[in-house]
């Protein structure tokens, strides 16, 4: 097959029999088309007849492959994407989860759509990530990245915290609330949406600041240019049990008086879709919007 891809990496949902079956089928399908296939190590433990030299760490997969195929739900895609965004690698997903905003391909009969993608007939989007840093006494203590959102919150349910928010060092607001969601357009259909945040289409260079149960009736979500730097300064009156969650996967500890800096990361995720992909069609299907009236 004449393809822009040569080496394809497979990443799967751990301990999921249906995902494992799809991966096995996918592996056989790609080998039959003549591609070099490598498999993420944890994923490979679920499959049979995978040569040991084709089992690699996720970072090595990002370095060696031209295309990564993630089999699972959006959570699996997020975990892989935070690592793969560091590399010049295209990523596509086969949905073995629930909603599947980021995983386009249907596990039943994915072959036809995937073969079109492999022949070069696809739509590519570049999704930016957030870089999250925690500073204590002006010293960087921890950092990570997020594809969907960074969430400042207490580690207790229904526990109020106090903080100030700055945009490019301009004071914006102080708040007593359960926390704050800082979302990318990719994450605007995830936790942010559940918190009352706006849907941001993927091409927008914007981030949304969504308060979580604020102790005021005037607090509303705020959308700002993604090239701005968001800084959250924690009040000294807070308890010690605070944290910043990145995509609900990585947790950074935060203490009273710390500052959390959130900004657009330099690297972007190369997310690809079948040629007939429509973002609005995905919204309509996943969110059960009404069909056309005429």
UniProtKB/Swiss-Prot annotation:
How is this protein annotated for GO cellular component?
cytoplasm
Coiled coil regions, renumbered to chain? none
Instruction: Show the InterPro entries listed in the entry.
Output: ATP-NAD_kinase_N (IPR017438), ATP-NAD_kinase_PpnK-typ_C (IPR017437), NAD/diacylglycerol_kinase_sf (IPR016064), NADK (IPR002504)
Entry keywords, A to Z: ATP-binding, Cytoplasm, Kinase, NAD, NADP, Nucleotide-binding, Transferase
List where in the cell it is found: Cytoplasm
Needed cofactors, names only, are: a divalent metal cation
**Which residues catalyse the reaction?**
74 (proton acceptor)
Has UniProt tagged this entry with the keyword tRNA processing?
Answer: no
Q: Does the keyword Transit peptide apply?
A: no
EC number annotated for this UniProt entry: 2.7.1.23
Matching SUPFAM superfamilies: NAD kinase/diacylglycerol kinase-like
Specify the domain of life of the species encoding this protein.
Bacteria
* One GO molecular-function entry: NAD binding
Catalytic activities: NAD(+) + ATP = ADP + NADP(+) + H(+)
Family as reported in the entry's similarity comment:
Belongs to the NAD kinase family.
The task this protein performs is described as: Involved in the regulation of the intracellular balance of NAD and NADP, and is a key enzyme in the biosynthesis of NADP. Catalyzes specifically the phosphorylation on 2'-hydroxyl of the adenosine moiety of NAD to yield NADP.
Q: What is this protein called?
A: NAD kinase
């Amino acid at each position: 097959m004449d393809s822009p891809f040569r080496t394809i990496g497979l990443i799967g949902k751990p301990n999921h029999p249906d995902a494992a079956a799809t991966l096995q089928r996918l592996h056989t399908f790609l080998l039959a088309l003549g591609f070099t296939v490598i498999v993420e190590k944890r994923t490979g433990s679920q499959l049979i007849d995978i040569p040991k030299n084709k089992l690699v760490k996720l970072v090595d997969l990002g370095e060696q492959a031209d295309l990564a195929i993630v089999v699972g739900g959006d959570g699996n895609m997020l975990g892989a994407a935070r690592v793969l965004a560091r590399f010049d690698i295209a990523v596509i997903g086969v949905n073995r989860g629930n909603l599947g905003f980021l995983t386009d391909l249907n596990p039943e009969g994915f072959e036809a759509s995937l073969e079109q993608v492999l022949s070069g007939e696809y739509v590519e989007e570049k999704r930016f990530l957030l870089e999250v840093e925690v500073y204590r006494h002006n010293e960087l203590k921890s950092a990570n990245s997020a594809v969907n959102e960074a969430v400042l919150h207490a580690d207790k349910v229904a526990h109020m915290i106090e903080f100030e928010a700055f945009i490019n060092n301009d004071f914006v607001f102080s708040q007593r609330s359960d926390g704050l969601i800082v979302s990318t357009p990719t994450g605007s259909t995830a936790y942010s949406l559940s918190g009352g945040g706006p849907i941001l289409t993927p091409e927008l260079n914007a981030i949304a600041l969504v308060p979580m149960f604020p102790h005021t009736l005037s607090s509303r979500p705020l959308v700002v240019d993604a090239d701005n730097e968001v800084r959250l300064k924690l009040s000294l009156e807070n308890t010690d049990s605070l944290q910043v969650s990145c995509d609900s996967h990585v947790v950074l500890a935060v203490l009273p008086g710390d500052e959390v800096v959130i900004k657009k990361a330099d690297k972007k995720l190369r997310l690809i879709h079948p040629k007939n992909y429509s973002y609005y069609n995905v919204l309509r299907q996943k969110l059960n919007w009404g069909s056309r009236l005429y």
